[in-house]
Structures are given as C-alpha cells and as structure tokens.
C-alpha cells in the first residue's frame, strides 16, 4: 500500500496549526513543493526552507499566525483532502466548486501542473481536486 503524501502534509500542517506552533517539517517531493508554493503565494505560509538530512530533503514551513489584542489566532482555518487514492474526484473548469463564495481556495492537479481554482478557471482547464483550504 502506498503513502498519500498530500494527506500527510495536510495533516501535518493542520496538527501544527491547531497546536499553535510556528514551524512544521514535511517531506519534499515535486507535488508537495508545488502545493507549498501555492500556500506561500496565497499568504497561508510566511517562509519555506529546504533542508537536507542524510540524503533526504525536507521542507521547513513557517506558518502565519495573525495577532490581535487577545493573542494570536490561526490564518488557516480548515484544510480538507478531497480526492484520495481510493476515490479520485475530477472536475471540469465550469464545475470547480467555490469555497465560501470565493474566499477559500481549491487546489487542483491539472495537465499544466498544480494550480488554484482561480488559475484553472482563467486557463479554462479542469483536473483532479486535491484539497480545499478555507
């Protein structure tokens, strides 16, 4: 049985975010690097470093926590894995769901790489729905 690396990084980020820690270390693959680039571009992550440890590469993510008078609160509220190895979910560009009326993002795997729902609608291509972030 294979590992679901996307579910692993989603779970790692969710656990660290709920624990109110700042950094998380995840395994580095092409898919995880592309998803992390999207999270960095959308403002959910402050910083990304690539770390090597005995011929294995890891990504060290610094999560963004906002501050107010009462203390810190989380930026990422929910991450949900949609398409999984046992049940793949595909969508064309017209039927890509809108999360919270466009406030959240959908990460898709398309023929042109991993992108957000807005980019996929602009390029008029569909693909596999990997996860929701809102």
From Swiss-Prot:
* GO cellular component assignments: chloroplast; ribonucleoprotein complex; ribosome
Q: Which organism is it from?
A: Vitis vinifera (Grape)
Q: What is this protein called?
A: Small ribosomal subunit protein uS8c
Q: Which Pfam families match?
A: Ribosomal_S8
InterPro entries assigned: Ribosomal_uS8 (IPR000630), Ribosomal_uS8_CS (IPR047863), Ribosomal_uS8_sf (IPR035987)
Q: Which UniProt keywords apply?
A: Chloroplast, Plastid, Ribonucleoprotein, Ribosomal protein, RNA-binding, rRNA-binding
State the source organism's domain of life: Eukaryota
The record's family statement is: Belongs to the universal ribosomal protein uS8 family.
Q: How does it assemble?
A: Part of the 30S ribosomal subunit.
Biological role stated in the UniProt entry: One of the primary rRNA binding proteins, it binds directly to 16S rRNA central domain where it helps coordinate assembly of the platform of the 30S subunit.
Q: Which GO terms describe its biological process?
A: translation
- The main location is plastid
Subcellular location per UniProt equals: Plastid, Chloroplast
Please tell me whether the keyword Ribonucleoprotein is annotated for this protein: yes
Q: Which GO terms describe its molecular function?
A: rRNA binding; structural constituent of ribosome
């Amino acid at each position: 049985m294979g590992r679901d690396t996307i579910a692993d990084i989603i779970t790692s980020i969710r656990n660290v975010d709920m624990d109110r820690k700042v950094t998380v270390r995840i395994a580095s693959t092409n898919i995880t690097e592309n998803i992390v680039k999207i999270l960095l571009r959308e403002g959910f992550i402050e910083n990304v470093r690539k770390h090597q440890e005995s011929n294995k590469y890891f990504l060290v993510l610094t999560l963004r926590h906002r501050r107010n008078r009462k203390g810190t609160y989380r930026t990422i509220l929910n991450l949900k894995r949609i398409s999984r190895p046992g049940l793949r979910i595909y969508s064309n560009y017209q039927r890509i769901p809108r999360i919270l009326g466009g406030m959240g993002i959908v990460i898709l795997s398309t023929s042109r790489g991993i992108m957000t729902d807005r980019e996929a609608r602009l390029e008029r291509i569909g693909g596999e729905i990997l996860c929701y972030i809102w």
